[in-house]
Amino acid sequence: MAASLAALPGNEVLFASEYGRRDFSLPGVKRVLLKKPKDRKKAVASISTPALDAGERDWTMAYLRGRATASSLMGVLAEGFEPDMVILSGSMGNGLFVRNLFPEAFLVGYADWYFRDEAETRYPLSTMPDIPLAPRNIRNTLQAKNFFDCNCHFTTTEWQREQYPEGMRGFISVLRKCVDTEFFAPAPASRFSFGDCELTERQEIVTLSVRDAARLREGGFWCELPSLLSARSDCHVVLISTGKEVRLDSLRESMAAFPSGMRGRIHLLDFLPPGAYRDLLCVSSLHLCKDISFMLPSELLEAMSCGCVVLAPDTGAVREVLSDGQNGFLYPSGRRMNWVMLITLLLERRSELLSIRRNARKTVFGKHNKNTLLPRHIAFLMDRYS
């Protein structure tokens, strides 16, 4: 969206984020690296003391993040840039002072998730993050402030929208996530090569994106990995970091306990360039989506767009895209799974799942195609702005 807006005559677009990537740029878009709190390490240490409960720690970090973001944006103002429109998320505190900085701007708020009292029934308790009551209420308060600061609001699935109170829900529009289906597309005679890892689509390959290495290491999938590789003697498992802040070092250390003959079939890859990531999806025999919380992950749509066989948790957001046995497969969210049995069953049916691959690609191409949806999203913003 940023690149498309920048391509329109007369527009100047800034993309502000706490994370910077030297290997990635957007045509016509100026990148702004948001400051993190200067005293972040000291702050984290001080607010991690037993004297502060979880709620106080969350409040403090939200304030520090909002203050650091405001400091960065004041630099933008000092350079003479006064935005007509700002698109922002308020759930972690970055948007706390945006309305104060840009009182005349049209603010568009991204509504990601609102914790409800009956969340246990709307989202299986065992799959919820370990967030006690006070931090949940704090995150809801940040969402509420963002809601009243902004002029219009959007989210990416009906399921997310339904979590908000009725009085807020009616003001939130659903703008579905879109994928570059020309870039994320099946490639015949696919080959993946990155560093020392070289794989082809002829091999049996299970791929998985890692959001939290510690959580994965302690979970059933990692513990069952030796059993899976023992049952599938030609299978390779590739784990990809979802960001430069997600380190796989702890997994590398833990892997030392695995039988030496198996370690060569476990590939731990740090954050990949877009092209390499796409090539990996194209050779994947099965892409496993794990540790998905509230939202519909882009990786699910990207994998389906590449024609992957996808195994994903049965959540409300995922069900809006994936139908079990039609264009992918669902597993019960929050339950302890027999990963060896489940993955083996799908790998054994690999040659029978061509229709699943075609349907996955067809679903994303028809409902989440960037060329179709992005002009609609921009038209929505321009209409609300006018």
Question: How would you label these PLM feature ranges?
Answer:
Residues 159, 178:
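Carbohydrate-associated surface elements
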Residues 40-57, 105-141, 182, 186-187, ...:
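Acceptor-binding helix/loop patch of EC 2.4 sugar-transfer enzymes
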